Amino acid sequence: MPDIDKHKLSLSFSRAAAQYDAIAGFQQQVAARLAQLLPAIPATCVLDGGCGTGTSSALLTRHWPDALLLACDLSPEMVRQAHARQLTAVCGDLEQLPFSKACFDVVWSSLVLQWCQPQLAYPELQRVLKHGGRLLFSTLTSGSLHELESTFGEIDRHRRVLPFASEQQVVDALYAAGFEHVQCQAERWVTQHADLKTLLTSIRGIGANQTGAARRPGMMGKTQWQAAQVRYENLRDADGMLPLTYSLLFVSAEKSRAQD
């Protein structure tokens, strides 16, 4: 995973915070799918890591109504949106969490860890979990956004999509961080869009434009933009829509019950 500029990432998501809920239908569907995998285990303290505006936190509260729910996000504006939902939320990076050791029974994170360095984030998540605690998250893996990568890559040769980890790399990194009983469920989701501009807005509009894939047309030149539109038109599906593929991975892992 490349070294992502977290300051730029935070600013990008902060700019998108006010409109995020209106655009992030895909992200909300992924969170709902992850919620279907929540374990029937007791929990007194739960963390929503990378909470965004806090919409996913309601899923956790519904599952563990008596638990203390804390949330964190890299973006100050996202945290403010979460506060408006009466959530206890703080600014925090999953690679350097502002919480003490072994304080959560469950850590949840939906579509956030693809932005993180696994060798930093996974040990941090393991650190803040209690022994026997559970980590549940969704992330993107290799093959995601391949239509964008091929379309734009053949035009200007610039990488416009993150080099997402493979499922095996995710599993290996979790075990290397000290997790046990790692279970994964891979799913391929395809979103449909009327045109390329709308497709890119589904990414850029939620702040996820640090991949480079959602750069504005004017930044790449009119001729290149028109060439990209022509190339992507060849991908229209049977419904007459432009597809965008997400290789999703839903993961559950456990921190060892043995004391350090």
From Swiss-Prot:
Claim: Lipid biosynthesis is one of the keywords in the record: no
Lyase recorded as keyword: no
Name of the protein in its database record: Malonyl-[acyl-carrier protein] O-methyltransferase
Family membership noted in the UniProt record: Belongs to the methyltransferase superfamily.
NCBIfam families documented for this protein: BioC (TIGR02072)
GO BP annotations listed: biotin biosynthetic process; methylation
Pathway(s) this gene product operates in, as recorded in its UniProt entry: Cofactor biosynthesis; biotin biosynthesis
Range of residues in the leader sequence: none
Disulphide bond pairs: none
Catalytic activity as recorded in UniProt: malonyl-[ACP] + S-adenosyl-L-methionine = malonyl-[ACP] methyl ester + S-adenosyl-L-homocysteine
Cited CDD domains: AdoMet_MTases (cd02440)
Record EC number: 2.1.1.197
Keyword terms: Biotin biosynthesis, Methyltransferase, S-adenosyl-L-methionine, Transferase
Protein's job: Converts the free carboxyl group of a malonyl-thioester to its methyl ester by transfer of a methyl group from S-adenosyl-L-methionine (SAM). It allows to synthesize pimeloyl-ACP via the fatty acid synthetic pathway.
GO molecular function, one term: S-adenosylmethionine-dependent methyltransferase activity
Top-level taxonomy: Bacteria, Pseudomonadati, Pseudomonadota, Betaproteobacteria, Burkholderiales
Annotated InterPro entries: BioC (IPR011814), Malonyl-ACP_OMT (IPR050602), Methyltransf_11 (IPR013216), SAM-dependent_MTases_sf (IPR029063)
Classification via Gene3D superfamilies: Vaccinia Virus protein VP39
